[in-house]
Amino acid sequence: MTARTGWPPRMVMRKAGGLRTLEAALIRGGLGPVAGVDEAGRGPCAGPLVVAACLLAPKAYDRLAGLDDSKKLTEAAREELYPVITRLALAWEVVVIPAWEIDAIGIHVANIEGMRRAVAGLRQRPGYVLTDGFRVPGLAAPSLPVIGGDAAAACIAAASILAKVTRDRIMVELDSRHPGYGFAAHKGYNTPEHTAALQRLGPCSEHRRSWRNVRERLGLRPLDPTVEYAETVLADGVADSRVAADAAHAG
């Protein structure tokens, strides 16, 4: 059989029409089954980063017509889709990276490590992996980054919902363990209410000490993520890094 040239593409793919386009093309090319990977909790100054991987069965696509980027869905819609996804998926895995580990290795490295762990934890090995936004080296299968992936590929959208629902539930639990911060409402993001609580109560164990606003409350100098984490990320071979963007993550 003659080898196909130019497929799979080596560059970052942008959003294509329809939530099944990318998976269908890969499966037609003999590169299935296709797993999607996405995260929830990159931006908040408190709580974990949650990363999910999801390998959808072909029959699942018709049953999951409501799939979309989790951020575009209501909380009720996400909760309704969550058990459907876990029931219809060929395999799925959720990884929780706590605040202390984010502080130790940086948010971008934590994101990449979480994606590696999630894919490695799938009980069925994917033929191909679609990641949301940037390249992830060291995966157990060939992969392709997709800009806007959670709105472009059904498997990434499914992973997005698994990650978001899991993290939201964790933040509700943390609200009862650390009362006064309002974690159940804002989920650890820098809302005015959270900022006021942080100033009033000081950081708890779930606040990320590497975030500028948390460090300022502790009287510590802000870190420069570009300097602190870039060497580690580049050493991992990440060409399309978000380190520079993360330099302003708590601004």
Swiss-Prot record:
Annotated EC: 3.1.26.4
GO CC annotation, single: ribonuclease H2 complex
Entry keyword set: Cytoplasm, Endonuclease, Hydrolase, Manganese, Metal-binding, Nuclease
Cofactor requirements of the protein: Mn(2+); Mg(2+)
Cofactor note: Manganese or magnesium. Binds 1 divalent metal ion per monomer in the absence of substrate. May bind a second metal ion after substrate binding.
SUPFAM superfamilies to which the protein is assigned, alphabetical: Ribonuclease H-like
Positions bound to a divalent metal cation: D38, E39, D132
Localization of this protein: Cytoplasm
GO biological process: DNA replication, removal of RNA primer; mismatch repair
Reactions catalysed: Endonucleolytic cleavage to 5'-phosphomonoester
CDD domains per the UniProt record, alphabetical: RNase_HII_bacteria_HII_like
A GO term for molecular function: RNA binding
InterPro entries recorded: RNase_HII (IPR022898), RNase_HII/HIII (IPR001352), RNase_HII/HIII_dom (IPR024567), RNaseH-like_sf (IPR012337), RNaseH_sf (IPR036397)
Start and end residues of each RNase H type-2 domain: 32-223
NCBIfam families, per the entry: PRK00015.1-3, PRK00015.2-2, PRK00015.2-4
Family, per entry: Belongs to the RNase HII family.
Job of this protein: Endonuclease that specifically degrades the RNA of RNA-DNA hybrids.
Name of the protein this chain belongs to: Ribonuclease HII
Native organism: Nocardia farcinica (strain IFM 10152)
Annotated gene: rnhB
